[in-house]
C-alpha cells in the first residue's frame, strides 16, 4: 500500500518518514519549490534549538529514503476513489501524475496572519514576530540597534472572527525579546 502526504513542512515530512520506516511507499506533495514550510522562516526555538540544522537533517532524510517520492511546486487537481483506494491527480513542475494510494495525510500547515491593524504594510517599522525573528537572525542593525521595541500580542485574534489563540505568538515574542536583550541589553522592550 502507498500513502499520500500533502504538505512538506515538518509535520508532513515527519509523517512521510514514519510511514516509510514502516515499509510503505509515500508520495509527499509540496506546493512550494522547497520542503520545510514555515520552519524555513524560524531560525531558532525558544529553547535555542537551531531550526535550520534540524530542518536540513530532516530534508536530507526524506530525500535519501527510497520509499519517499517528493513532488515540488505541486497542486492537487483531482481525487477519485474510495476509502483505501484513491487516485490523486497532481500537477508538479509542469507534469501530470496520477498517484494511487490507500491512505492520505493532510499536513498543510498554516500561514502567518497579515495584519490590517497597527499600520502593518504601511509603516516599515511594523513587523510580524516571524519577520522580526528573521531580521534579528540576519543582524539587521535597524532592529538590533534600536533603543526601544514594542510587541503587540494577539493581533487579529481573540475577536469574533478568530476567537482562538495560535499558541505560538507568546513564545516567539519571548524568544525575540531574549535574543534582542542578549544583543542589546540597553533596549527597552
How would you describe each model-predicted region?
Residues 47, 54, 58, 81, ...:
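A sequence-level detector of short, solvent-exposed, charge-rich linear segments
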Residues 1-35, 41, 95-98, 107-189:
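Rossmann-like dinucleotide/flavin-binding elements
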Residues 33-54:
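Conserved N-terminal glycine-rich FAD pyrophosphate-binding loop of Rossmann-like flavoproteins
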